[in-house]
Structure formats: C-alpha cells, structure tokens
Amino acid sequence: IPYSILRAFGVNMFLANKIVLIAFHIMGSYTMYYLLRRKFKISSLWSFVGVVIFSYSSAYYVRIGHTQLMAISLIPVLIIFIYSFFEYFESNKKRIIYGFLSITSYALIMYTSWYTAFFTALFFVTLAIVYLAVAYSNKNHVLKNVWAYVKKCWKEVVAYVVYAVCIVIPFFMLYIPVSRRFGERSYGEIVQQLPELIDFFNVSTGNRMLGWVIEKLDLNGRAETNGMFVWELHVGFSIIVMGLLVFLFFYTRRKYLKAKYGALESKGVYDNNDMTLRISMIYSVFVSFILLVQSNGASLWLFVYKLFPGAPAIRAAVRYNFFLTVPIAIII
C-alpha cells in the first residue's frame, strides 16, 4: 500500500521500493522497543538489546535480499494489538477495537508476505498449545475462562470470524489457484533446506565477528556433499544470543518451578499469568528449534508438512529461524 501511494505520486519505482523498505525497518525497530518497554515493562537497556536482536541481527542482514521477508517488521505491531486486546479486556469498546485491529494487521501481513504470515500462525499455534499444557500443569483451567468469554460475547466472536473471512477472501482467491499449480513442494526438496544442529549458530561467512569460524567449519561445502541449499541456512544466532537464551531457559524454569510448587501446596493453583506466558514462550522457542532441526534427512518438520495448512508451499522452512528472532528478542 505505501509503495502504491508513492508510485501514484510519481516516485521512481526503485526509489519507492527503497523508501518503503527503510520505513519498514525503522517502524519495526520503534514498535519493538515500544512493545518491550511499554507493554512488557522491560527496562530501557534490555528493550534496546531486544531491538538489536530483532532488527539488527545477522539473520535480518542476510534475509533482506528477499524483501518480502522484511514484513517481519510488522510483527511487533500485531503483538501490540493482541496484547492490548487482553490488557483492555474488561473494556468492551477497547477490546473490540483491538480485536479488529489484530485481525486486520495479520491479514495485511498475509497480503505482504505469505512466509511471514505462515510462520506467525505456526508460532502462535505452538505457543497456544504449550501455554495450555503449562496452565493445565498449574491447575489453572484457562479453557473455562475462554469458554465463558465465548458464551458471554458470542456475537462479538462471530463478528470477528465473519470479518476475518471477508478480509482474506481476495487473498485466497488469488493464492489458492497459484498454489495448486506452482506452490506445493515435495518434502524431499524442503528437507534439503532444514538446518542441522550446527546451523543454529550459522551466521554465514560474511559475519564480521564469527564469519571466520563458519569458514573454518566449511559449512558451505555441504552444497556439494549433501546437496543442501546452504545459502538459505545463514540465519543462525550468535553465540552470545544463544548463550543468553539457554541461560534464561534454566534460570526462568527454576524460578517458575519454585514458585509453582509453593503455590500448589498453599493454594492448590498457580495463577501467575505473566510467568506462565514467559515460560511458555521460552518452551515454544525450543519446541520450534526441535521441529526445524534435521539429521540425515530425518526431521519432525514432517509433521508440520503433513498437518499444518499451507506448509507444503514453504520451500525454505529454515527461514522460521529468522522469524524466531521476534520471541527471542521478547524473552531476552
């Protein structure tokens, strides 16, 4: 839409494209900082660190060659709307406004980049399943609250569904015929672009800090030996980021379990929703890693390929690693 507006005013097509991409990057950086600082109440320093991990990562630099993937900069806006939906849940007017804004922003992401929309849906489904499992272990029956909301506000829920269907009809009218003709990939083609364990650290030979290590490991040599699309695998994380993530996994898990068992003994339920969401997000990131990783062609991504709608059209599934910079930035 911004590109079309610029072109309508006579801006050169290449300049219009560059302006939109730069604007996306700036907007993504600012909205991520706003999300971390204002919504998640993270300190200014760690909010800045989160922005760097998300918007100035090695993976972002590598993937900007595929300009559609810069739609990842829209994800913080989507999360802000979803967070605000729950934040103002008791206010009918604000809840409904943010509900429709959430649906609209996701639909716009679909129109901009199918990869980004698919990975967003996949992660949110993973997070929802993990969150329900964690909440159940806390004796916190979240589904009862969801069902109570649906029963009380069923007209609102129906309105969301109808609006969501209507707004994406043009997308699917265009996408489904093309997908049937050209989009479906064989699993054998996809698995060649799934990361091995070492690729979660593969920041490419062009990385100024760790590029020499990647070059020594000769990871690009797998193009000849295994037929792998090695240029798609350069979306790993730095040792510092991965180290922080692993540390926070154990630190947060220990803190969560201590508080959980104490609450279960005293109250019979652990109802700290903030901690439940945080630990669920950490678990979801590692579940996503497990789904992605492959060894000698064997990968749990096969279940995603078989069960998740639209998955056969995702040729370079390793790009999910790039999307995971969003939850990792929030966690760290």
Can you annotate each of these PLM segments?
Residues 90-94, 135-153, 254-276:
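Membrane-interfacial, low-structure loops and terminal tails that flank and connect transmembrane helices
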Residues 169-253:
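Periplasmic/ER-lumenal interhelical loops and adjacent helix-loop junctions
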Residues 30-38, 77-85, 124-132, 241-252, ...:
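Transmembrane alpha-helices and membrane-interface helical segments
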Residues 1-29, 52-62, 66-72, 194, ...:
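Membrane-interface coil-to-helix junctions
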Residues 162-166, 235-278, 285-289:
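Hydrophobic, aromatic-rich transmembrane alpha-helices
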Residues 104-105, 128, 143-174, 185-196, ...:
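Hydrophobic alpha-helical membrane-interfacial segments at the cytosolic entry of transmembrane helices
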Residues 20-22, 26-39, 44-135, 157-160, ...:
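Membrane-embedded helix bundles of polyisoprenyl
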Residues 60-70, 189, 193-196, 216-233, ...:
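Membrane-helix boundary/interfacial segments in multi-pass membrane proteins
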